[in-house]
Every structure is written in structure tokens, then in C-alpha cells.
Amino acid sequence: MVNAILMACILAGIFVGMFNEVDGIQILSKSKLEKCEKTSDSGNLNCSTKIVLNLAVPSGSSGGEASIVAEIVEVEDNSSSNMQTVRIPPVITVNKSAAYALYDLTYIRDVPYKPQEYHVTTRKCEHDAGPDIVQICERLRDEKGNVLEQTQPICCPCGPQRRMPSSCGDIFDKMIKGKANTAHCLRFPGDWFHVFGIGQRSLGFSVRVELKTGTRVSEVIIGPENRTATANDNFLKVNLIGDFGGYTSIPSFEDFYLVIPREAAEAGQPGSLGANYSMWMLLERVRFTLDGLECNKIGVGYEAFNTQPNFCSSPYWSCLHNQLWNFRESDINRIDRHQLPLYGLEGRFERINQHPNAGPHSFSIGVTETLNTNLMIELRADDIEYVFQRSPGKIINIAIPTFEALTQFGVAAVIIKNTGEVEASYSLTFDCSKGVAFVEEQFFIIKPKAVTTRSFKLYPTKDQAAKYICTAILKDSQFSEVDRAECQFSTTATVLDNGTQVTNPFQIPETQPKGFFDSIRILWTKIINGLVDFITGDTCRNKCSSFFDFSCHIQYVCLSWMVMFGLLLALFPITCLLLWLLHQKGLFDPCYDWWEDHFDLDHHRRLLPSRADVVNRHHHHHKHRHHHNHHRRTHQRHKHHHGQDDDVLQKMMLERDHSDSHYYHQLHRVHKDSKQKQRRRAKHGIVLPRDVHVERQRKQRLRES
């Protein structure tokens, strides 16, 4: 270590040649050092001498490659402090590709490019009306044939101040054809767009280092996904330390959504987006409604459109502003005025999706600023000592669960074990086949005989179900490969989500029959449906607001209403007839008798004499008998028995009163029975001569009086 302190990283005679006219390439430091390898606790070291170069390699701003050539001609020997010329000078060539920023994408859902409101002028607008009435605004159905209630039309009355001004017609049109109205509906014809959430960004580029010594050529390629490499002859080793920050920050789009046009594909699979980057747009997240419940936002659905307040008095196309086509038209107008677009990618960014292995659903932009990469190159030489520990390792297992492409990201869990006897550092590279975004190499330290797990996030660039092959490469502290393992994982196809919109593409319903037999079938179906509806009355219940809406019921010929209205009109005469029949059967005779017994006073006066009349009759009868007995008996006998006769007379009067009451009671019963018989004879139409005679006498007395 003393030699390491004495040697102050001195290298001389460095000649640097520049190609492609790229400025700013710098050699940051140069040195010689002796690296000693320790493989066990025995203390034995395996040492070798290296020449170390620390370079700052820029990226080309034009998208081409920037190169440097460094030829080492002289080195300083520590033992003699003299400059010595290298007999065969090595030539180092470094090429760095253009840098790009690669962004993680997460599929959110699909949205329509231009939602449209349709209206139909009609006179029979109803929510469940067919295409013959509301035409394009007929309710839609899903793949299973179920009616989608949220797609039903909204009916608005006619008038000049309505959502769609229309004439109401004259009074004759209203009476014959019905009142005019308009049907409004939301539909999604035309293009659809994928919506992606934008996640973290990663910087991408590649550095190619070539070392030529005489006729021998060593070459390595490194980048953020593979930051260390060793040539096959172990003469050259390269380590990518990192990048120097620029003055301009790389844009972050975490508050934006990327919208990409959805192209047609076979068998319902999402199509490739191709290179139609002119339609790609970046829009703020606040402009979207992912649940479709907000008006005037991208992704608006049926519920938001149908439930907007004051629908019929709101302007036409309300709730459908700020859609994708509005932003696209705004960009086109700016481009026509020779201005930069505000939402589109073309014109704002360079080298869109030109990174290696670009998939149909990946997103990258070119970095226009020159970025410097810190690169360390090691060559064989003799210099200072540097001791490091090296230990073998092994990849035990790799596990990658199946996941949905684009919507989710995969996680590769790699289990590694230090199989040596010393603690050492390792690096792990995870390289996948085409179609998976690259992942950066990881560095870590493992204790002897210990096991650790390293995780990598995998982002496929395709939305179809596919299988991928990945290779995990374990490197030791000398960047030499110590183990390699392959694995496979699968992804399921991205499930496209249209939100609250109809899942199947919108098509205008067919209203015309396709042939003669189809016409017969449609006619027969209409007849059957009309007959069923005529009997059940579903149309009347849905279209007529009240029971007494006569014009509506007459217009739609409602059978149930006609039956109910006829029953209502026939209720009064039927009730009267029923009461008359019950009267004829004598059901109400007890009621009549009860009324006569309690409330018919004139009848009682005619049949029952008063108490005074009865007493007077008794006294008159007594006087008559007493006068008759006065002439037959002597005065003495009458005088002797006068007191006894009075007592007997009083007793006889009471008995006579009782017998008279019984008589009149029997007379009342006979009169009542006669009235009942008279009613029965009248019911059956029987008239007796005696009844006729009595009736004639009653009429004669009335005329005389």
C-alpha cells in the first residue's frame, strides 16, 4: 500500500485523437496500479499490474455516434522515475450512441376520439322506442343481446328554446299524430385511443470500447443495462461509473397520460400502433375522467351525458367538450400558423421511439443535450498494488409469475449464493429477449455462504400474450462471469377497457329488411308483438301518463284501458240493477218492517187506537148496560149492590183492555203479512180481484175527498 501512496496516478504521453468533430471529450485521470486477487484466507495474493484510464465520453446531439481514440505511447516507471516508451502502443477507440429517455407505460383504458350527440325529430319518442321511431338513438345491446339501459334516448319536447329547436306543428297534427318531440342520444363512432399512464424514466445509450494492440483487437459493449464488461482475452476491462448531469433536465411526464390511436386487428386483438406518431398526444391527467361520470372530459360516458342538469334546455353538444379531437384540431391550427404544437409529440420531441428493440407500446424520446458518461478502462501494466476479494457464486433460482402485459409489470426474483469463503462483491445482469425493456445491472455484496435475492422489474413492450426468454448473468468482483441461468415467463394479453362506453364498436342499427323472407319474418314478428302488447298493455302503461289521458289511450288503442273504462261506466247501472234484484228477492223486507215499526207513525195511528178511546168505549158500554139494568132491577137491589158492581166493573174493564190490545196486535200482524204477500204477488206479477177492488175504492175515496 506504500507504493500506492507514492504513485500518484501518473501517466504521461497520452495522445488523444478525435473523430467526428465531437468536442468536450476529456481524460479525467490516468494511472497504473497493481491489482492483487485474494481467493481464500491463506493470505496468498495473485497480483497483476494495470493501466487505468478514467474518461468522460459525450453523446452526440445529432443522433450519430461520438468517438474518441486514445493512443498510449509512454508510461512512467516508479522504480526509475523515468519515462519509458511502450513498445507496441495500444489504441483505444470509444464510440457512444445517442442517448434517449425511456419511460415506463401502464395501460389504463381506451377512450373515444370524438363522442357525438345525435338527435331525431319524432312524435312518439320513448326510452324503449325502436329504430322505426328513434332511428340511430335506439337502445344498444351487448354481445349477449342484453339491452344496455344507459344507452336509451332522452326525449325532449318541441319548442324554439329547447336543446334542438323544432316546430310543434298545428293542433290537428297534435290530435292526429301526437305532440312533436326530439330524441337525443350519445354514440361513439370513429376512432378509439389507448390511454397509458407514464411512470419513471431511465436513460439509455450504448458505449463500444475497442482496444487494438498490434494485430490483436479486444472489444466490449456496455450501457446502463450492462455496466461492466471484460474482453475475451482479459486484456481489457471496462466499467461504466455513471453519467454527469446536464444543464437541461430530462422531462418527466408523471402528471400526463399518453394517448395512442388504436388500430384495427384481427380476432379482436389490439393492433400494432406502427409509426403514426403524428396522432400521439400527451395530455394532463386532470383532463380525463376514468369512470366516465364527469362532463366535458376525455372518457365521458352515458351516465354523465344522460344525468346532466337541465338537459332539454342545455345547448346542443353540452357535456361533450374538451375531447381528443378538440386538442388535435388545436394543434393542427397552430402548425398551420407555423407554431409548435401543445399536445402532440411530433414537433416537440426528437427521435420518438427510436431506441433499440422498440415495441409497439413503448415510449422514448431522444435526449438533445450532450451527456457525458464516466468510463473507467483497465489495461495490463505494472504499477501500484490494490487488494480486492474475489469469490465464486451461483444462481440458485429465478421466479417470474405470469402477469398482464402493459397493465402490470413483472417481477423477476433471482436467488444468488456466495459459494466461496470470503465476502465479495458481485454484479448481476438480467438480459431478456426482444420485446422487454432493458433493466439496469445491479451491484451488491454477499457474505460467505450467504444467500440473497435480487429483484428486477420487467416491462413488456407488446400487448399480446407471449412468452419471453431471459438470461441472468452473475459476475464477480473482477467483472468476470461466474454463472449463467436462463428462464422463461409468460404474459397475458392486455384486456382493453372502454370504461362506461359500449364494449362493442358502435354501428348504426339496420332498419331495412334484407330480403322477401326477412320482410315476412319482420312483419309477422311485429304482428305478434303488437298483439301481445295490445293484450298486456305495456305500451299504454309506459306512454300514457294517467288513467284519464283519453287522447293517448285512444291513439295507442289500449285494450286494458278500454276494459277498465267500460267497467267504470257500467258500474252505476249494474249496481242499481243488482239492488233491484235483491229487492225483488225480498232480501230487504226485514229492513222495511223495521222501518215501519219504528218510524211509520201514521200507520200506527190508523191501526192502534189511543188509550183514551179504549177507556171511553168501556165507559160508554158500562153506561148503556147500567141504564138497561135500571129498568129491569128494582131501586133497592141496585142500591144494595152498588159498591160491589163498581169493583166488578173495574176488573172487567182491565180484562177488556187487555183483550183489545191483543186484538189490535193480531190485527197488525195480519196487516203486515198481507203487505208481505202483496209484495210477493207484485214481484211475480200476480194481481187478485180483491186487490183491484180495494184499489178502486181507495181511488174513489180520494176523488170524493
From Swiss-Prot:
GO terms for cellular component: endoplasmic reticulum; endoplasmic reticulum membrane; plasma membrane. Disruption phenotype: Defective in pollen tube guidance. Prevents gamete interaction and fertilization, resulting in male sterility. Residues 690-705 have a biased composition (Basic and acidic residues). The chain crosses the membrane at residues 562-582. It is found in: Endoplasmic reticulum membrane; Cell membrane. It is a single-pass membrane protein; Single-pass type I membrane protein. Residues 25-561 are extracellular. InterPro entries: HAP2/GCS1, HAP2/GCS1_dom. Residues 1-24 form the signal peptide. One of its GO terms (molecular function) is lipid binding. Keywords: Cell membrane, Disulfide bond, Endoplasmic reticulum, Fertilization, Glycoprotein, Lipid-binding, Membrane, Signal, Transmembrane, Transmembrane helix. Residues 617-642, 668-684 have a biased composition (Basic residues). Residues 583-705 are cytoplasmic. Belongs to the HAP2/GCS1 family. HAP2/GCS1 family members mediate membrane fusion between gametes in a broad range of eukaryotes, ranging from algae and higher plants to protozoans and cnidaria, suggesting they are derived from an ancestral gamete fusogen. They function similar to viral fusogens, by inserting part of their extracellular domain into the lipid bilayer of an adjoining cell. This is Protein HAPLESS 2. The gene is HAP2.
